[in-house]
Amino acid sequence: MRRSKADVERYVASVLGLTPSPRQKSMKGFYFAKLYYEAKEYDLAKKYICTYINVQERDPKAHRFLGLLYELEENTEKAVECYRRSVELNPTQKDLVLKIAELLCKNDVTDGRAKYWVERAAKLFPGSPAIYKLKEQLLDCEGEDGWNKLFDLIQSELYVRPDDVHVNIRLVELYRSTKRLKDAVAHCHEAERNIALRSSLEWNSCVVQTLKEYLESLQCLESDKSDWQATNTDLLLAYANLMLLTLSTRDVQENRELLESFDSALQSAKSSLGGNDELSATFLEMKGHFYMYAGSLLLKMGQHGNNVQWRALSELAALCYLIAFQVPRPKIKLREGKAGQNLLEMMACDRLSQSGHMLLSLSRGKQDFLKEVVETFANKIGQSALYDALFSSQSPKDTSFLGSDDIGKIDVQEPELEDLARYDVGAIRAHNGSLQHLTWLGLQWNSLPALPGIRKWLKQLFHRLPHETSRLETNAPESICILDLEVFLLGVVYTSHLQLKEKCNSHHSSYQPLCLPFPVCKQLCTERQKSWWDAVCTLIHRKAVPGNLAKLRLLVQHEINTLRAQEKHGLQPALLVHWAKYLQKTGSGLNSFYGQLEYIGRSVHYWKKVLPLLKIIKKNSIPEPIDPLFKHFHSVDIQASEIVEYEEDAHITFAMLDAVNGNIEDAVTAFESIKSVVSYWNLALIFHRKAEDIENDALSPEEQEECRNYLTKTRDYLIKIIDDGDSNLSVVKKLPVPLESVKQMLNSVMQELEDYSEGGPLYKNGSLRNADSEIKHSTPSPTKYSLSPSKSYKYSPETPPRWTEDRNSLLNMICQQVEAIKKEMQELKLNSSKSASRHRWPTENYGPDSVPDGYQGSQTFHGAPLTVATTGPSVYYSQSPAYNSQYLLRPAANVTPTKGSSNTEFKSTKEGFSIPVSADGFKFGISEPGNQEKKREKPLENDTGFQAQDISGRKKGRGVIFGQTSSTFTFADVAKSTSGEGFQFGKKDLNFKGFSGAGEKLFSSRYGKMANKANTSGDFEKDDDAYKTEDSDDIHFEPVVQMPEKVELVTGEEGEKVLYSQGVKLFRFDAEVRQWKERGLGNLKILKNEVNGKLRMLMRREQVLKVCANHWITTTMNLKPLSGSDRAWMWSASDFSDGDAKLERLAAKFKTPELAEEFKQKFEECQRLLLDIPLQTPHKLVDTGRAAKLIQRAEEMKSGLKDFKTFLTNDQTKVTEEENKGSGTGAAGASDTTIKPNAENTGPTLEWDNYDLREDALDDSVSSSSVHASPLASSPVRKNLFRFDESTTGSNFSFKSALSLSKSPAKLNQSGTSVGTDEESVVTQEEERDGQYFEPVVPLPDLVEVSSGEENEQVVFSHRAEIYRYDKDVGQWKERGIGDIKILQNYDNKQVRIVMRRDQVLKLCANHRITPDMSLQNMKGTERVWVWTACDFADGERKVEHLAVRFKLQDVADSFKKIFDEAKTAQEKDSLITPHVSRSSTPRESPCGKIAVAILEETTRERTDVIQGDDVADAASEVEVSSTSETTTKAVVSPPKFVFVSESVKRIFSSEKSKPFVFGNSSATGSLFGFSFNAPLKSNNSETSSVAQSGSESKVEPKKCELSKNSDIEQSSDSKVKNLSASFPTEESSINYTFKTPEKEPPLWHAEFTKEELVQKLRSTTKSADHLNGLLREIEATNAVLMEQIKLLKSEIRRLERNQEREKSAANLEYLKNVLLQFIFLKPGSERERLLPVINTMLQLSPEEKGKLAAVAQDEEENASRSSG
C-alpha cells in the first residue's frame, strides 16, 4: 500500500523524535528517502539520501539511489556521476555499467565517455541487443566514414540473431542509403523465407517500400525481364503479408489505403503477364488474396461503424469470398518455405480455408443466399458498388484492378466439407500452429454438422507426439500427448463459442456473422490459455531458452492437472460432459482399434469424473473457481432433469469400451440393461458381427443354428429401433446413424435369414452355390466388434463391407492369371479323352491348383477349390491367426499349370471328390517338422512336378503330403490296382493303353476314420479298400518343366525345440539417428538346443525368411517395457542376424497386451531354465561340512594376512615365525589344514545341498551359466565346487563366457559350460580340493608398474573429502573434485605437501607444498571446512589458488588441522611426522573390504566338536589347525564354496588394512602393534595353535581372563601356553578355565633402534603395504565373483531359515545372526576384532555351549561400554 506524503512525514517525525543522536538521524536517511520515493516526493528523497551519504559516503546503494532520483529529474550528468561512483565502490554491478552507457549515448553520442562505457559494457554483456544498439548509435554519428564499420557490425549481429527484425531493417536501410538497391532487394528476397520476419508488420512495410523503390529506379530499367518479374513476385507476396498484418493491427483508414496500394501493384503486374511462369502463378494467387482481404475489410467496417447496413456489407463480402474461393490453386512451385513446404501452396490452402468457412458462415440459415448474391452483384453494377465501398479515392475505376477485373463468370459454388477439412490442414501449416487460428477454425466447425479434424491438425504440428499416455494420473510435462492438446482445444473452442453467443444481444442482425473473419476478429482465447499453449509448443519443439525451461515446465505441469480432471481441477461439469461426448463420438467413427480404444477410454475417464459431480448437482450447485483455465457459463449449467440422461450416456460409453476391449459378454449385459435406441443399435452391431464371424467357415448344423440365432437377435433389435423411432421422433436424434441406415441393415439381415431358411449358407434353391460367388472374407481388425454408429451400416463409401476388399483382390488375381492358364487349358482340352467324364466347373475347365495359405471361402467341391496361387499348402479355408492379404498376392511366376493327358481328368460332380483331408490341408513334397523323427522314404527322384518348397513354417497343423510313401497319401495309392502294383511318378509303361476302369470312383474315404487318426499323425495311412480300382492303371504324368533335384533344406534349427512362437513386429534402435527402425514382420521363436540346453531367440521375416534376430538368451538379459506402449518389450543382446556379433537394442511389438505379457512370462521361464537348479526341500538337516570348511578357509586367509603384517614390522617376529615353521607350528597355517571333529558325534547337523537359487539368479548380472549343487559323498576330504588359480581335469564349472563373439548361436551346438555334481568326478584321498580353472574371455595385458610420484613419501594423513576452488570471476566457490586428500612427507628432504586426486579418474585436484606461512581457517557457518591459500600445481603450472576442503565428520576435520600444523613444525625441525591415517581404506583401494568379509561370515553355519586327545581347541585363535596324529577320523563338515590357492587372494580377508606403525605404543607385553606374539605351544608330538590376538584390546572377558604378567617374546616363543585367552568346556571334557583381570598395567615394549634403522624399516613397511595393495587390486575381478556367490549363499540361508524342520537349531541360528550383525555394524577396531574368536568358537560348539557363550559375550560388551565411557 502506497503511503501519502502526510503519512510519511508523520512517520519520519515520530522516528526522529525518538532518535537523540544527529548521526543516528542521518543513518536513517536512506530509509526515509525510500519512503518519500514511494510517495513520489523526489526532492525530499534527495534531501534525506544526501544526509545519509554524508555519514556513509562509501555505500554504493545510496549513490545508486541518488542517481535514480537524478535520472527521474532528467539530470543526466549528475545521474551518470552518481552511477559511476556506485560502480567504483562495487564493480560487480554490471547492469549499472550498461545504464551509464545508455545515458551517455542518449545525452550526447559524440561524448568520448560514451565510447568508453559502451566498450566496457560490451565486455560484460557480449551479444546483447542493447549493446548492439549503442554501438549502432556511435557509428551513426560518424556519417559516411562509419558506414563500413556499421555494415560489419550489422553483418556480425545478423549471424548471431538472424530473426531480429530491427537488425534486418537496419541493413536494408543501410543499403538504400548507400544506393545499393540491388543488394537490398536480394536481402529482402532471402529473408522472406524466415517466418519470424514474415509475421512482422515493420519488416513487411520495409520490404514493400524497398521493392517499389527498386522497380522505379533506373537500375530496374537496365535489368533484364526475369529480374523484373522476380521483383514483382516478391512485391505481391509482401503486399499480401502486409495486408494481413494491417487488418489485424491498424484502423480501417490505413487498411483502405493499403488495399488500394495493393490494387495498384496487381494492376501494374497484370499488364506484363504471359505464360505459365512464377509471376503468373503468383498473380493468380494474390488475386484470390486481394478479394479475401476485401471481404474481410468490409466486415471490419461493419464492426467499427455506426448505423451499419449489415445486409449490404455481408452480400458484398460474400461476393468477394466467392471470387476468392473460386480462384484455382497454383500448379507450379514458387519457392520453398520452412520445413520444405511450398509457400504458394500453403497460402492457397489458407485462402480457400478462410473463404470457404466465411461463405458457409454468411449463408447459414439463409436459403439461396449465395445464388441471390451472384445474381445481384456479379455484374458491372455490383463491381461499381464494391469499388465505392472499399476505395475512397476519386481515381477512375477503369485504371484500377478491382474496377477492370471480370467478375461475371463466377458460379454459385458452396464449399464441400471434405474439401474444407483438407484446406484446413494446409492453413494450419501456414499459420505455424497459432492458437488464435486453431480456435477460429474450431468455431467455424462448431456450427457445422461434421466433427472438426482436430486430430489431423495436431498431427501436422506435433509429428512425434504420442496420441495417448498410459500415465493419466501424473502431471509430468513428458507425459503430454495429442489427446491432451485435443481436449484443450475443445475447451478453448467451447468457451469461446459460449462467450460469443453471450455478446450477441437482441439487436444482433441475422446478416452479421457470429464470428468475424480471422484477420479482424478479436482474441478468442485468454492470456492464460495462450501462454500455456506457447509453453507446450516450446517444450515439444525444444526451443526453450535454458534459463526459462524450469518456468515453462512448471506452467505446463500445473495445467495438465486441469486437462486430465485431476485433484481440484475447477472444471464446469458441462465442459466435462462436452469432452466425454465428443471423444466417444470421435472414437466410434474410427476404424482403428487403437483409435477407438484411446478415444473411448479417455471418454470413460471424463465420465467417471462427471458422475460424482452429477450426484452433487442433485443437492447443490457446483462452486465456480476464482480464476479457472476455462471460464464457467451459467447458461449451460446442468439441470436436475438432465442428470438421468447423462448417467445413461455414461453407462453406454462404459459398455462400448468393454466391447472395444473384447469383453463382449460384459458389453452385451450392460447394453441390455439400458433401454434406449443407442444400446439397441450397439447390440445389433455386436450380434451381426458374431454372425459374420461364424459365416466365414464351412458351417456345421450347430454353427448354422447359432448363426441364425445371432441374426434373429440382430433383426429384433433393429425392429425395436424402427418402432421407437416411428413412435417418438425425438428418439431418432439420439440415434448415432440415420434411420435409413438402420432400415438398410434390417433388409440385409432379413435376406440372410431367408438364405438360411432355404438350405443354409452353402445351398441355394437346392443346388450348390458357385464357389466364386460365395467366397466371403473378414477384413482383420484388432477388435472384431468395431462400433461405428456414426457411419451407415454397409453402403458407406468410406467403410465398404469387410469381405469386399479381399474379394476384389482375389478376383483381380484370378483375372491376371486366367489368361496365363487359358493357353495351357486349350491344349489340355485337345489332348483330353472324349470317353472320360469331365469335371464341371462353373465357367471353364481349369487344372487343379492349390490355394494360398490362409485363404478361406465357400467351396463347391471338397478338396477342389477355386485357387489363385500354387505355393499355399491348404485346400480348406483355414484363416491364419495373423491374416495377411499378401498371401493372396503371390506373384504369377509361381503359377505353373500342369500339362496332363485326358487320363488325368477328374470325375463329375455326381460322383464327387471326397478326399478325407484334415483342416490343415495338403502339403506337397515335404512333411511337418513334427514328423521328422518318423521313418521316411526318400522322395522319388524323377521328373515329377509335384515337389514344392517347404512351407511348413506357415502352419502348425499337419496335412496331406504328396510325394511320400511311408505314411503319406500319394497318387500311387489313388490308382492302385487289384494286383497290388504301385505307381511312381515318371515311370513309363509301354503296354499302357488307357483307363480300363473309367467311370468308377477314384477317391472315396470317410472323414470320421481320418479324424480319429488326426490326433496322432498328420499323414494319411494307406487304406487298400478305399483306393482299390478294378484294373492296374499305370498313369503317366509328363511334367511341363523339369524340376531340379530336391535339396534337403537345412535351417540350423534341426536339433532345437520350439518353446515359444508368436507373430510380432521387430524393431532395432539406430544409435546414429536415435530412432527405432522396423526390422521385419514374422514369428519370434524361442528355441532350446536338445543337446546342451542352450536357449536362443530367432526371428525370420515373412515370405523372404531373412533372419532379423538371432541371439542367445542369458540370465543377464532384462526385458523393459517400451515407453508409450503396453504391447512392446525391448532388450539388448549380441545379435548374429547379420553374421557377426553386434550389440543391438531390439524391441518386439505384439498385437495385444496379453500376448506381450505371455512373451514376458515365457522369457523369464526360459531364464529360469538356464539356471537348471532343482528345487528340493531337505527332510533332514545333515551337516556335510561345507560351512565349517568355508569358515576355516576364510579364517586361514585372515590369519595369513595378519601374520604377514606382523612379519613386516619386526625382525624379532620373523625369528619367531621361523621357529614356528621349523617346529611345524606355522601360525599362518597352510591351506591344507582341515578340521577333524569326533567321528562318534551324533548331534544335529546341517545340510547345504540342493540349492534353490532361481529367484536370486535372475538378478545376477555376472554369470549366465547354470549351477547345480548336489549332496557330497561322505568322504573325509571332499572336493570343493569352486577353485581359483588352479586347473583340474575334473572341473565342472568355468567362468568362460557363454557367448563367444566369434561364433553365432546357430553354429555353436556345443555347450560352453558343463553342469555336474561332485559325485561325477572321481577323487582320491590325495586330492584335497578340485582346482577350478577360470579362462578369461579377454586376456589382460601385462602388468605395468604405475608410478604416481608418491613412492618416496610417507602418508601422514589420508581421508575422503571434497575440495573447492574459489573462482574470482564469478565470486563463487566451485567444486574441484571428490577423493582422498593426503598429506605426504618426503623421506629425504622432509618436505611436506598436500596431494588430492579425484576418484576413479585420479586427476590431480590439489598438489602444493605446505609452507610455514600457510594457515588454515574455518569457513563461516561450518567447522568441518578448512580454507587456505597456496601456490598450486594441480594443472601443471604454478597458480595461486584459494582452496577449501570439506570433511564429513568433525573429528576428521580436526585431525587434518592437527596434522597440517605438525607438518609445518616438522619441516622447520627437519624431522619425520608421526603418521595418522584417519580411515582404514577407500572403496577403490579395498575392492572386497570388511563388508564382504562380514557377509561371508554371516552366511556360514557349522557345528563341530572339540578335537580329542591332547589337541585342545583354541577358541581365541583365528586359525584352527588339526592334530597330526596318525589316527584320522572322518569329519562330517561341508567344504567351502570357495578355496583360494593364491596367497594374494587370501589376503583380502584381513579385518584391518595395513597401517603405518607407531613404535612405543601401549600394548601389553608380548604384543606388537596390537598383535599378540604369545603363541601357545603344544606337546612334543602335537602342533601348536597360534594366538592372533591378545593384549589389552583383545580381552574376551576382563573379569575371567588370566594373562602372563611378565612375559616377553622370547619366552612366549619357547614356552608352553598354559593359560588361554578364551576357552569353554565341552561335554567330553571337564577342564575348567579361569579368566582374571591383570593386576597391573603390562610394561611397555621398548625397541632401541637408531634413526636410520627406523627410517629404513618404515620405508620397507610402506613399500610392502603398497605391494599388498597392488595384490588386492589384482584380484578385484575375483572378489566380484565371490560377492555374487555370497549372495547365493545368503539366499540359501534365508531359505533354510524358513524351513519348519529347523526348530531345534532356530534359536542358535538367531543368536549367531545377532552376533554377526554386531560384527558387521561395529566400527573397524578392537571392538570388532574381539567378536571374531567368539564367532569362531560359537560355530564349533553345541547349543548348550553357545548359550554359555552368549552370557560371556554380553558381559564382555557391557564391560567394553563401561571402559569406553
Swiss-Prot record:
CDD domains: RanBD2_RanBP2-like, RanBD3_RanBP2-like
Per-repeat ranges for TPR: 26-59, 60-93, 648-681
Sequence ranges assigned to domain RanBD1 in this UniProt record: 1036-1172, 1333-1469
Compositional bias segments (type: Acidic residues): 1317-1329
The keyword Cell division is annotated on this UniProt entry: no
Polar residues bias spans: 1235-1244, 1580-1593
Other comment: One of the 8 copies of RANBP2 clustered close to the chromosome 2 centromere.
Positions of modified residues (Phosphothreonine): T19
Biological processes, Gene Ontology terms: NLS-bearing protein import into nucleus
Organism: Homo sapiens
Keywords carried by this UniProt record: Cytoplasm, Phosphoprotein, Repeat, TPR repeat
Tissue localization of expression: Expressed in testis.
Occurrences of domain GRIP (ranges): 1702-1752
Cross-referenced Pfam families: GRIP, Rab_bind, Ran_BP1
InterPro entries: GCC2_Rab_bind, GRIP_dom, PH-like_dom_sf, Ran_bind_dom, RanBP1-like, TPR-like_helical_dom_sf, TPR_rpt
Compartment(s) of residence: Cytoplasm
Protein name: RANBP2-like and GRIP domain-containing protein 5/6
Biased composition annotated in UniProt, kind: Basic and acidic residues: 931-941, 1594-1617
Sequence positions bearing Phosphoserine: S21
Recorded GO CC terms: cytoplasm; nuclear pore
Compositional bias ranges of the Low complexity kind: 778-797
Region of interest called Disordered, as start-end residue ranges on this chain: 760-804, 924-945, 1214-1247, 1306-1330, 1580-1621
